[in-house]
Amino acid sequence: MKKLISLFLVLIICCFMCGCGKEEIPSSDVTGTTNIKQGIVSEDFNEKGTGKLKCSQEAVAGEGIDVDLSYLVSYKNGNILELVSIQKVVSSDKSSLDLYENAYRGISKNYDNLKYYDGVVVRDSNSVTYTITINYDKIDIKKLLEIEGEEDNIVKNGKAKLSLWLDLAGKMGTVCEEV
């Protein structure tokens, strides 16, 4: 759970400093979509099959800072096989980018020696992008839990559970659709 908390730490810092807003998306009758007002529920998706979810979360990080959060979740039989998280912060303010870059690098450092957990921070002149790829199908779950802690995480019986991730993501205002 520490990883998930860490992933959202930067967003929370940003929200605390600058406020946070959500764009209300109209409801859809298409299976596999949901809106922020409704929240994500695992029953919206075919957990018993194999599939991919494309998810996004919008955040307002203050004047001159744009934050885009997106996730690609591959799953089979209710278990997450792979999770790709992309967090991109765009700003012309160097000090804001420094704050995000340092936070992302600090988070990523905790996982440096964990095989099948890849965290990459890329900085350019007006953005910082933090991409995390976790192969839950191959990662050593015990080592992952040593880093993250066993309390309040998405792992149950040694597997990363889609329903638990969807519950957590839904609380953060994440919107998903099957792809």
Cite the ranges covered by each PLM segment.
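Intrinsically disordered, low-complexity repeat segments enriched in small/polar residues
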Residues: 6, 34-37
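C-terminal motif of bacterial Sec signal peptides marking the signal peptidase cleavage site
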Residues: 15-19
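Bacterial signal peptide processing site
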Residues: 21-23
